[in-house]
Structures are given as structure tokens and as C-alpha cells.
């Protein structure tokens, strides 16, 4: 049994997220593989929710105990994570500073005024746009923001990009795996594969540890959307090792149990390909399930392609982890102006 119970948790979500069968998407892909989705995009009333809240539930107690008064984080201009940090700060009564780096070469005229960044500002966060490019690692701009809060007499609590390399960043998605096991028992089925987008790494990393408990670590198929696969894999490896130790998995996760596919991140982080756009439209038109051009659109593209290529044996049950992120589609309004 994984020792997730020894960590404090601050509730930010509605609880267990639903799993639904996607019959029309299943049929559109030939019907030989059954597609399901776990709807972490519907997990909370905090500013449209999303996967980062699972992570933040285990980070907030540490922030409160540190006597911080300001959460400080970082992401791109259309960052789901900074939206969720801003929402969390508003909910728990802290101030919030978020650095929003220019991770995406955007062309839409309203990219920096709608969607995630609009909601981040609406919730009172101090949103600071910085011209630095994409990188999933620890950033100087974030460290500068933390120092600026100190210089102003505040007490900052730093949360890195995606909450991923935070010591507790992987715990929430260990909990995801435990939820899935309980839901499988209720539904009378068992999923053969889990599809998840990976960039900063703690969502997949936590899942890998969680599913390692029942021998399914290598069935967690990460679809890279970073375009920096070596860096992403190294970060996932680090998160897996740290999280496995925290929850007392009792063994080291092997390298071959960390499965990340690098075929779908093109042409660049945050830039959808024609195939990404086709996947977004197919999910929307078959299941009214909205995915975004940065993350979920690419993992949806990956899953669709894998089904078509026969990656999953006939009769497989595939669980698509919908992590949220739909607000970002507003930053791509020209691309989707006609649907």
C-alpha cells in the first residue's frame, strides 16, 4: 500500500473525478479499442479547474505552515498552471505573483489578453510578462520574482513551473492512480493503457509511481508536448524517484517503465500541427470534449494516431487523462475562428 495518507492535503477539488466512456470517439476510430476519459478538467469550481489542483492540494499545507503570504510561480503567457496558482491563492487568502514567460511564438492578436492570463489577472494575481523563451527547468525570472517579494517585505512561497519539481509535486497523481483502481473495481473493468500529456513531468511521474503499485507503470503512456524530450524524460525520472521514496513504493521504477512518446510535439511547444487541430476537432465533434492546442490536443492527437496504427491490441480499454486547459484555446481564436 502506498503511503499517501501520511501527507497533509488541503481540499481544492470536488473529490473523485468521473470516468466516462467515449462511444462516438471509439466508433470514429474503428471500434476495436474502447476509449474512456477521466475528467480532471471538471475537478473543481476554482477557475475552471484542471490537473494542477491535484498537485497543489499537497503543496498548500506546506505553504501555510511556512507562514508565507504570497505564492510565486511561473509559466507561459497562456499557462494553466499560473491560473491555478492564482485561483489557489485567492481561495486560501494569499497574494500571488506569477511570471509569464514568452514560451510560445504566438500570432493571435489577443493571445496575451484572453483565456488563462485574463482569468489569472481577474483573480488579482500580479502577472509579470517576461520575454524569455521556453524551458521546463528552474528559471532566473522566477527566482527574481521570489526575491522581489522578499525585498518588498513579503513572505514568498515558490512553486516551480507545473508544480513539478516541488518536493510534493508528484503526490497528487499518485492519488489519481488510487482513484482509478477504486473506480475500476466499481465499474468491473481494468484499463490496459493510460494516455497522458507530459511536459514538466509530475503528472505522468506521479501516475507512474501510483500505477507501479499494481504493475502498470509501463502502461502509462506519456505523450510529450514539450519538444525537449531528453530534458522532460530526465525530469520525469527525477520526479518518479523522489515520489516513490515519499510514498514508500519499496522499489526503484525501471527506466523501461517510463514510457514517453516523442512523435507529437511538433512543430514546437504550444504550436499545434494540422494533426493536432484535426484531433481537437474530432474530440469536440464526437464527444463535445474540448481539448487545447498546447497539451491535451497533442495527447489526443497521440492517442488517435496510436489507435489507428494498432499500437493497442484489439479489445484494449484505453483511459485518456483529460487534464484541463481548455481556456488556452481562446488565445488561438484565429486558428479556430471557423471551428
Swiss-Prot record:
Domain of life of the native organism: Bacteria
Entry keyword Chloroplast: no
GO BP of this protein: 1-aminocyclopropane-1-carboxylate metabolic process; amine catabolic process
Catalytic center residues: 79
Gene3D superfamilies: 3.40.50.1100
EC numbers on record: 3.5.99.7
Catalytic activity: 1-aminocyclopropane-1-carboxylate + H2O = 2-oxobutanoate + NH4(+)
Entry-linked CDD domains: ACCD
Keywords: Hydrolase, Pyridoxal phosphate
Cofactor: pyridoxal 5'-phosphate
GO MF, any single term: pyridoxal phosphate binding
Function statement: Catalyzes a cyclopropane ring-opening reaction, the irreversible conversion of 1-aminocyclopropane-1-carboxylate (ACC) to ammonia and alpha-ketobutyrate. Allows growth on ACC as a nitrogen source.
Subunit structure: Homotrimer.
HAMAP family: ACC_deaminase
Family membership noted in the UniProt record: Belongs to the ACC deaminase/D-cysteine desulfhydrase family.
The protein's name: 1-aminocyclopropane-1-carboxylate deaminase
Species of provenance: Bradyrhizobium sp. (strain ORS 278)
Source organism phylogeny: Bacteria, Pseudomonadati, Pseudomonadota, Alphaproteobacteria, Hyphomicrobiales
Gene responsible for this protein: acdS
Amino acid at each position: 500500500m502506498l503511503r499517501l495518507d501520511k501527507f497533509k492535503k488541503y481540499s481544492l477539488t470536488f473529490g473523485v473525478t468521473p470516468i466516462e466512456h467515449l462511444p462516438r470517439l471509439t466508433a470514429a476510430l474503428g471500434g476495436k479499442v474502447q476509449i474512456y476519459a477521466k475528467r480532471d478538467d471538471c475537478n473543481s469550481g476554482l477557475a475552471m479547474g484542471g490537473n494542477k489542483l491535484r498537485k497543489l492540494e499537497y503543496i498548500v499545507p506546506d505553504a501555510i505552515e511556512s507562514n508565507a503570504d504570497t505564492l510565486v510561480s511561473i509559466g507561459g503567457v497562456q499557462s494553466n498552471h499560473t491560473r491555478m496558482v492564482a485561483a489557489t491563492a485567492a481561495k486560501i487568502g494569499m497574494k500571488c505573483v506569477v511570471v509569464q514567460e514568452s514560451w510560445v511564438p504566438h500570432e493571435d492578436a489577443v493571445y496575451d489578453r484572453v483565456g488563462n492570463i485574463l482569468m489569472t489577472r481577474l483573480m488579482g494575481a500580479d502577472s509579470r510578462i517576461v520575454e524569455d523563451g521556453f524551458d521546463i527547468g528552474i528559471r532566473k525570472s522566477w527566482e527574481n520574482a521570489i526575491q522581489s517579494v522578499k525585498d518588498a517585505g513579503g513572505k514568498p512561497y515558490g512553486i516551480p513551473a507545473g508544480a513539478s519539481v516541488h518536493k510534493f509535486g508528484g503526490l497528487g497523481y499518485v492519488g489519481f492512480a488510487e482513484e482509478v483502481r477504486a473506480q475500476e473495481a466499481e465499474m468491473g473493468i481494468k484499463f490496459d493503457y493510460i494516455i497522458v500529456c507530459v511536459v514538466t513531468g509530475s503528472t505522468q511521474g506521479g501516475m507512474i509511481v501510483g500505477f507501479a503499485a499494481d504493475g502498470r507503470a509501463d502502461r502509462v503512456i506519456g505523450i510529450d508536448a514539450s519538444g525537449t524530450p531528453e530534458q522532460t524524460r530526465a525530469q520525469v525520472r527525477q520526479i518518479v524517484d523522489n515520489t516513490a521514496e515519499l510514498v514508500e513504493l519499496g522499489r526503484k521504477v525501471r527506466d523501461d517503465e517510463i514510457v514517453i512518446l516523442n512523435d507529437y510535439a511538433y512543430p514546437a511547444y504550444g504550436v499545434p500541427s494540422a494533426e493536432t487541430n484535426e484531433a481537437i476537432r474530432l474530440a469536440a465533434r464526437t464527444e463535445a470534449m474540448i481539448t487545447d492546442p498546447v497539451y491535451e490536443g497533442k495527447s489526443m492527437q497521440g492517442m488517435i494516431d496510436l489507435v489507428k496504427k494498432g499500437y493497442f491490441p484489439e479489445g484494449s480499454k484505453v483511459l485518456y487523462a483529460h487534464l484541463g486547459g481548455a481556456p488556452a484555446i481562446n488565445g488561438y481564436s484565429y486558428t479556430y475562428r471557423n471551428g
